A protein has these predicted regions:
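Active-site mouth loops of central-metabolism enzymes
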Residues: 17-28, 77-84, 117-119
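A structural motif
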Residues: 42, 100-103, 142, 166
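Short, acidic/polar
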Residues: 25-37, 83-98, 153-156, 177-178
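CE4/NodB-like, metal-dependent polysaccharide N-deacetylase domain
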Residues: 87-108, 135-139
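Acidic (Asp/Glu)-rich catalytic clusters
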Residues: 10, 58-68, 95-100, 159-162, ...
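A short, structured active-site edge motif that brings together acidic residues
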Residues: 68-81, 102-111, 173
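N-terminal binding-site loop/beta-alpha segment at the start of enzyme catalytic domains
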Residues: 1-71, 200, 284-285
Length: 285
């Protein structure tokens, strides 16, 4: 069962292959969503400072009835923190807000502030933020550290001047958005890829080819999308607060044939994410 399967990070820490994404889940609903997911077998919860629901997520983890060490909890340093002091301070604030003594992983949310996504040169700021993560990791408050939305030059920048190598790169990865070059780079550097929005924020469900292929496998289009990123060797982080969707998203114990995987890898890119296109990560940059 996928909820019991894990990958092993470069430092030996095990991370569940399937997690609950919490983007767009309001803080007031987050604790219940987390408790529900954990009751259904989820052991991996992903949040971020920018989601503004860390308090609720932390409450859900603390009150789920399971020992803390059984739940893998990730948060993200806000994209705007591009200096050591603000990044370090934000990590401590996250721990306090969540009511947790440690996080299983903390990652830099973006190599650029959202207002300048894929814009200016923030290499020095990213190295400074990374040092804050390294120091917090060394202090034992974080079990693993990584990055998000990083391309090869961003990764090279961190790798050129680090004491602890990034363990993950959490990226937009789904059918119709598969950067094979970046996946190869991460594999070469022993960086695990995590896929946020593996269902393309719902847009993949509108693709007739995906719907038809899913029917051939006897699964939903969403399940095919989640299985796809798992077949690529990535962590899947579908977001939902709906218990039925949580159950369905975890029912992915099937295999996509190599031929179908090749077809899915070559699916034409999504050019329009509908009402969510204004978000920088969906802008095509």
């Amino acid at each position: 069962m996928i909820l019991q399967e894990t990958y092993t990070l470069s430092n030996g820490v095990k991370i569940p292959k399937l997690g609950l994404g919490t983007w767009f889940i309001p803080d007031a609903q987050a604790s219940e969503a987390v408790r529900t997911a954990i009751s259904l077998g989820y052991r991996h919860i992903d949040t971020a400072q920018a989601y503004e629901n860390e308090a609720g997520v932390g409450e859900g983890v603390r009150t789920c009835g399971l020992p803390r060490e059984q739940i893998f909890v990730t948060s993200k340093v806000a994209a705007e923190h591009k200096d050591y002091d603000s990044a370090a301070r934000s990590i401590d604030e996250t721990l306090e807000k969540m009511g947790l003594d440690y996080l299983d992983m903390m990652i830099i949310h973006s190599p650029q502030p959202w207002a300048d996504f894929r814009g200016g040169d923030y290499a020095e700021g990213n190295r400074a933020a990374w040092r804050a993560l390294e120091d917090t990791y060394t202090a034992g408050k974080l079990r693993a550290i990584g990055v998000s939305n990083c391309r090869k030059p961003d990764l090279d920048n961190i790798l050129s001047d680090c004491r602890v190598r990034p363990m993950v790169d959490q990226i937009l990865l789904h059918i119709s958005n598969t950067d094979l070059g970046l996946l190869d780079t991460c594999t070469t550097q022993d960086i695990l890829v995590e896929a946020y929005s593996p269902i393309a924020h719902g847009e993949a469900l509108k693709n007739p080819m995906i719907v038809e292929m899913a029917a051939r496998y006897g699964v939903s289009a969403a399940q095919l999308c989640i299985r796809y990123v798992l077949e690529l060797g990535a962590v899947a982080l579908p977001k939902t607060a709906d218990p039925e969707h949580m159950k369905a998203n975890a029912t992915v114990d099937f295999t996509i044939t190599p031929d179908d995987m090749e077809l899915l890898k070559q699916t034409a890119p999504i050019k329009d994410y509908g009402e969510f296109s204004f978000f920088p990560v969906f802008s095509g940059k």
